[in-house]
Each structure stands twice: as structure tokens, then as C-alpha cells.
UniProtKB/Swiss-Prot annotation:
Keywords: Glycoprotein, Isomerase, Signal, Virulence. Pfam families: DA_C, DA_N. It is an enzyme of class 5 (isomerase). Residues 1-25 form the signal peptide. Coiled coil: none annotated. The keyword Signal applies. Its EC number is 5.5.1.-. One of its GO terms (molecular function) is isomerase activity. This is Hexane cyclase gkaB. Hexane cyclase; part of the gene cluster that mediates the biosynthesis of GKK1032, fungal natural products containing a macrocyclic para-cyclophane connected to a decahydrofluorene ring system that show potent antitumor activities. Within the pathway, gkaB functions synergistically with gkaX and gkaZ to form the cyclophane. The pathway begins with the PKS-NRPS gkaA which, with the help of the trans-enoyl reductase gkaC, synthesizes the polyketide-tyrosyl acyl thioester product which can be reductively off-loaded by the terminal reductase (R) domain in gkaA. Glycans are attached at N77, N153, N184, N308. Pathway: Mycotoxin biosynthesis.
Length: 441
């Protein structure tokens, strides 16, 4: 079975071709290639598609370490992984982008290697672009005081990012047959840790980087202005301005071992920026872990990992909403959410309604979770966000994105064989198959 699936995955690999050339409206311009100005002060990690480090490697748990820098060095081993994530949506909410750079050995089972790019785009006409790509090599460079830069590349395609060390600007560039262009994020908020406190880089406080057992989380750019300028395979050009941010995740085990599902939100409404993660642990079975950030005009109002009502500590309250127009195809039929931030010390409460507008990614995950639930999978939406401080004279409106999923506990061999066979029917089925399985081990 293993040999069959690995062979099938190789046959299903997506072939990429020529590049597009198009002048860009994004400023400042993103670098097409990695900077060549590194020196002896820089940390450099280069990895081939199938490389894993033999033995124990350096795995960062310190809250003092730079959020964008390498968390695993000199390279991932057979169990741990890390990723850099960037996202944004347009002012209208009709367009969005989610781009994830991963070093992750959990899908090497399929012969595709360890270097994954996930690229999901919502288009104004309601269509979407879903790219799952595996690259031949990646290089990540961190030069203290200057930048972190990364490139995932093969002979005929590449994806790169560069983040200033003050984490105020991220520049992304991508060249492939599917999409060619640039995406920039300019922060108007301060970087934060999993416990909701702001990152200073000066002290190591135990446990504040860990979102749930085994999973570490940080928010280099909670919110900021984004610019997208890209040309699609069809020749269509996608240009928009809006808001978005970036997230860092690194972990000691694969997703299915760590959690049964999650929901995450990034959005804005008027002067407010909201970021929220909710995760159901499988290490501590069924325990819910949360983290939330609320900014106004770039200043942190509430930062907390407390998801329970309290008379003394700041907390969040998250609730799914139903009855709207846009929902996923799976058991989770929610059409949005309500997210509250409460601060007993400030004697204030803020409430935001988050309504799904448009789907940017969706796929089904066959199987059951540990509670016998079926209809599992992952969905992503652009959102309409409205709200503000409870008791204020006005409510603000903005946009954002949601990603939500529920994972099966395991996939039987028959289900995997069916999914593998489905890949022969086209790139969309192939993408669904490999994407789902990439989280299994």
C-alpha cells in the first residue's frame, strides 16, 4: 500500500511551465530572489526536498527568540515542522489570498518531499485558485537586525518572502505557471505571542509561545495593509489593496496527532483589528485552547489566552452563527461567528459579528473523529466584519478571513486508496488528496 500510494503521488505531481512578465503596482518591490548580502552574523538553513536532520535538532521554545527567524535548526527532523503564513483580503471582501511556506516531513510518505507551498486565492467573480506545490529546495536566512528571507524553489518556479527584522514589512514574490506576482504586508500593529502579550525579544517567559501541547504560535504581523498584484494562468490580473497579516507556527508532531480541529480569524472593522485562534487538543484530549488579540488604532486593548468567563482576567467568547447565505459543504454549517473580547479591569466589552462572504478553499476529509462525527474537512472564507465597543454610539464595518476545520482521528487504508485514485481525475482532486494526507502523520 505504501509503495502504491507513493507511486501514485509521484504520477500526480503537478507540472509547471513558463513564467509571466507583468509590471507591478506593489510598493516597495519584493525581491525576486533571496538577498545575497548575508554574512557571518546570519543564520542560514538550506534544505533539499527529501532532507531531514538525523537526531535531535534545535527546537525553539523561547519567547525571546525572533518570531520570524528559524525555529528549527539546522533543519527539520522526522517529527517536527515549521511554517510561515501570510494572508490578506481586499477592502470589498471579494478577493483574498492565503500563502503558506512549510518545511514538513509528514507527507514524505507520498514521494513529494518535505517542502510545501499552499496558495489559496478568492477571485472577485466567485471563482478561486487553489495551488498545492512541492518544491525541490528551500533556503531560509535570518540576519539579526536586518531581515528573515526564505525561498522555496524548483528549476521552473519559485516562491519567496522577506520580512524586515522589525516585522513592519513583509514582501512576497511568486513565479509559477499558475500565478506570477507580488504580495506585500505593511504592519500597523505590534507583534504578539501565544499568550496574548506583545513580543519584546528581551525576556524568555516559560510557556508563552505554546498555543497547545506541542504546537507553538506567534503573530509577527497581527494586522496591516496589504497589496496584491498578480497574473493568473488564465491571463487575468488580480490587483487589490486591503488588510491582512502574518502568522508563525512550529510543532513537535503532525496535525492529526496534535489536534482534532481549529478555527482562526483575522479581521478588521474601522479602527479595530482582531486575531483569534481556537484549537481542540488531542494531546490533552478534547481540551480547547484559545488565543485572542484586539487592537484599536494599532494599540493592544486585549491580549489573552483565556477562553472562559472571568471576573478578574481578560477573556474571549467565541460563538458560531447560523442562517446566513454562505456556508461550507460539511457538517459544520455555520455561516459566521460572533467574537467578544471582555476586560473586567477596563470594565469594557467589544463584540464583532463575522459573516462569511466568499469561499477561498474547501476540501473534504474522509473518516470519523474520536467522537464518531463525520462530514469533516477544511473550509476558508472571506468575511464581512462589523462591531466595536459595546455601548458605543456606532458600529464599524470591515473585512477579514476565517479558516476552520475538523480532522478525522485516522484514515483507513481503503479511504486513502480511494483518495489516491481520485487524483487521476484531475489536479483539483489531486490537490485535495495530497493536502489532506499532508496533515496525517
Amino acid at each position: 500500500m505504501t509503495k502504491f500510494l507513493a507511486g501514485a503521488a509521484i504520477v500526480l505531481a503537478v507540472a509547471f511551465g513558463s513564467f509571466f512578465s507583468q509590471s507591478s503596482t506593489v510598493t516597495p518591490p519584493a525581491p525576486r530572489y533571496l538577498p545575497n548580502d548575508w554574512d557571518s552574523t546570519c543564520t542560514i538553513s538550506k534544505s533539499g526536498a527529501y532532507e531531514v536532520y538525523s537526531g535531535d535538532n534545535s527546537f525553539s521554545t523561547s519567547s525571546a527568540d525572533h518570531l520570524s527567524a528559524l525555529k528549527i535548526h539546522p533543519n527539520i527532523n522526522s517529527t517536527n515542522w515549521e511554517q510561515w503564513e501570510f494572508d490578506g483580503s481586499s477592502q470589498t471582501g471579494l478577493s483574498s489570498v492565503l500563502l503558506v511556506f512549510s518545511r514538513d516531513p509528514s507527507y514524505s510518505f507520498f514521494g513529494q518531499g518535505n517542502l510545501r507551498i499552499e496558495f489559496y486565492i478568492a477571485l472577485p467573480d466567485g471563482k478561486r485558485v487553489e495551488v498545492l506545490d512541492y518544491l525541490e529546495e528551500s533556503t531560509v536566512v535570518h540576519c539579526p537586525g536586518r531581515y528573515t528571507a526564505g525561498m522555496w524553489n524548483s528549476t521552473d518556479r519559485s516562491y519567496s518572502f522577506r520580512i524586515d527584522d522589525n516585522m513592519k514589512n513583509a514582501q512576497l514574490s511568486f513565479d509559477s505557471a499558475k500565478i506570477h506576482g507580488k504580495f506585500n504586508v505593511t504592519s500597523d500593529t505590534s507583534s504578539a505571542l501565544a499568550d496574548g502579550t506583545l513580543w519584546t525579544g528581551k525576556d524568555d517567559r516559560k510557556g508563552v509561545s505554546e498555543l497547545s501541547p506541542g504546537l507553538f504560535y506567534a503573530v509577527p504581523i497581527p494586522g496591516g495593509f496589504v497589496q496584491m498584484d498578480a497574473t493568473l494562468e488564465s491571463g487575468k490580473r488580480l490587483v487589490f489593496k486591503g488588510k491582512g497579516g502574518s502568522t508563525r507556527l512550529w510543532a513537535k508532531a503532525g496535525w492529526l496527532n496534535l489536534c482534532g480541529g481549529w478555527k482562526n480569524i483575522r479581521g478588521w472593522a474601522g479602527p479595530y483589528t482582531v486575531v483569534y485562534w481556537e484549537l481542540i487538543s488531542r494531546i490533552n484530549k478534547g481540551v480547547k485552547y484559545t488565543t485572542g488579540l484586539l487592537f484599536r488604532d494599532g494599540e493592544l486593548l486585549v491580549g489573552t489566552r483565556n477562553g472562559n468567563i472571568s471576573q478578574t482576567e481578560d477573556y474571549t467568547v467565541f460563538e458560531d452563527l447560523y442562517g446566513g447565505e454562505v456556508k461550507g459543504s460539511f457538517a459544520d454549517q455555520s455561516t459566521g461567528h460572533n467574537l467578544k473580547f471582555v476586560s473586567p479591569d477596563q470594565e469594557k466589552e467589544w463584540s464583532f459579528d463575522i459573516e462569511h462572504m466568499h469561499s477561498f478553499v474547501e476540501f473534504r476529509a474522509p473518516g470519523e473523529d474520536e467522537y464518531g462525527n463525520k462530514g469533516l474537512g477544511q473550509s476558508g472564507f472571506t468575511n464581512r466584519v462589523s462591531g466595536g465597543e459595546v455601548g458605543e454610539d456606532r458600529a464599524y464595518e470591515g473585512r477579514g478571513i476565517t479558516e476552520k476545520c475538523r480532522w478525522p482521528k485516522e484514515f483507513g487504508k481503503l479511504a486513502l486508496a480511494i483518495a489516491s485514485g481520485a487524483g487521476f481525475f484531475g489536479p483539483k482532486f489531486q490537490m485535495i488528496f495530497i493536502k489532506v494526507v499532508s496533515y496525517l502523520v
